[in-house]
From Swiss-Prot:
GO terms for biological process: cell division; centrosome cycle; spindle assembly. Residues 49-79, 128-178, 249-277 form a coiled coil. It is found in: Cytoplasm; Cytoplasm, Cytoskeleton, Microtubule organizing center, Centrosome; Cytoplasm, Cytoskeleton, Spindle; Cytoplasm, Cytoskeleton, Spindle pole. Keywords: Cell cycle, Cell division, Coiled coil, Cytoplasm, Cytoskeleton, Microtubule, Mitosis. Component of the HAUS augmin-like complex. The complex interacts with the gamma-tubulin ring complex and this interaction is required for spindle assembly. Associates with microtubules. The interaction with microtubules is strong during mitosis, while it is weak or absent during interphase. It is unclear whether this interaction is direct or indirect. Interacts with EML3 (phosphorylated at 'Thr-882'). This is HAUS augmin-like complex subunit 1. The keyword Cytoplasm applies.
């Protein structure tokens, strides 16, 4: 089997031979089109070889018939003193036509018994040739359709590939952008951690109480919220005492007790707030 390079070279030589001095139509060179054109060139080469053999055979037959005609002419001249030169123009024309027909039909003589079978065979050959020609036309039409469909499919695939490459490029750009953002965020996070650590070390060196750190302040804020929640029922309890009409001394005692509890809670609350303000 011929290599792809040899096939491409043979196709180029065949196209140059077919089109001669005319320019070869542009076509896309790929393995599919090269294979199709290679098979066509092979068939053309086989057909040319067969035609050459037929021509050589006909030349040989013509030479044989010319020799036979010369022999018959000599025989006529010797036997009946007959010469084609003695024929009229129409007679010479008919005789030449008869000889040419005999040569073309490849028959041994010009008798009717030889002409009729030869004409029948020639007619059969003509029908077979026409049938073969129609088959080749149909096959060539199929090949052209397949070639067209292949070229269209190849064009579609190229367009799809181009779209996929563009989409891949866009996705790659997005990924690169996200990676850059991620690297930036990582760098910022490391910078913040380093800054926090440096600030903590600096504050610790200045003697700052660890209880005033952000975490401790957040815990104090939660504790403050809890204390505020605890004062709510005490305030309600105090309000309920204010609404009653007991003995003045007992009521005053309860009020003072509630006020002391409330003052203690508010004092603790104020202390916590002051610490948070620092």
């Amino acid at each position: 089997m011929a290599a792809p390079e040899e096939k491409a070279l043979q196709v180029a030589e065949w196209l140059k031979k077919v089109f001669g001095d005319h320019p070869i139509p542009q076509y896309e060179m790929n393995s599919r089109t090269t294979e199709i054109l290679y098979h066509l060139s092979e068939r053309n080469r086989v057909r040319d070889r067969d035609i050459s053999l037929v021509i050589e055979d006909l030349k040989q037959k013509a030479s044989e018939y010319e020799s036979e005609a010369k022999r018959l002419e000599d025989f006529l001249m010797e036997s009946v003193n007959f010469s084609p030169a003695n024929l009229s123009k129409s007679g010479s024309r008919f005789l030449n036509a008869l000889v040419d027909s005999a040569i073309a039909l490849e028959i041994k003589d010009t008798s009717l018994a030889s002409f009729i079978p030869a004409v029948n065979d020639l007619t059969s050959d003509l029908f077979r040739t026409k049938s073969k020609s129609e088959e080749m036309k149909l096959e060539l039409g199929k090949l052209e359709k397949n070639l067209t469909a292949t070229l269209v499919l190849e064009k579609c695939l190229r367009e799809d590939l181009k779209k996929a490459e563009l989409q891949l490029s866009a996705e790659k750009a997005k990924v690169d952008s996200r990676l850059q953002n991620m690297d930036f965020l990582k760098a910022k996070a490391a910078e913040f951690r380093f800054g926090i650590k440096a600030a903590e070390e600096q504050l610790s060196a200045r003697g700052m109480d660890a209880s005033l750190s952000h975490r401790s302040l957040a815990a104090l804020s939660e504790k403050l919220s809890e204390l505020k929640e605890q004062t709510i029922p005490l305030k309600k309890k105090l309000e309920s005492y204010l609404d009653l009409m007991p003995s003045p001394s007992l009521a005053q005692l309860k009020i003072e007790e509630a006020k002391r509890e409330l003052d203690a809670i508010e004092a603790e609350l104020t202390k916590k707030v002051d610490m948070m303000g620092l």
